[in-house]
Amino acid sequence: MIAKEFETFLLGQEETFLTPAEHLAVLIDTHNADHATLLLSQMTYTRVPVVTDEKQFVGTIGLRDIMAYQMEHDLSQEIMADTDIVHMTRTDVAVVSPDFTITEVLHKLVDESFLPVVDASGIFQGIITRKSILKAVNALLHDFSKEFEIRCK
């Protein structure tokens, strides 16, 4: 369990580690593979969130998913180019709710580079990246004593 003071400090950094949906490049589940490939090849992220037109979270997709789907189904480039990405989207993705705990985020980010934040209605709210959490932990290590007093028991 994380000490209450540490969790309070880290949650105070939430603005720095929660990237809202409106500031992200996302794909719509009906986009075709050509569109997704173009977007993914121009980004630094290896995966991006996939949502419906109504902002319902579907999953995530990366170039590897697109290539694997094409090879698995032996599809030509022409057919693949027009195929909706919903068929190749990874749906078994770890997510957190907007009322996440730091413990939950830290445990899930061990295996994922980012966590989608999805509300109870399934609406995509944004992401928390491993990099942003590491920056918050760095701030904790450098700035904690400016706000809190550290004493030995």
Residue spans of the language-model regions?
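Tandem CBS (Cystathionine beta-synthase) repeat/Bateman regulatory domains
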Residues: M1-K153
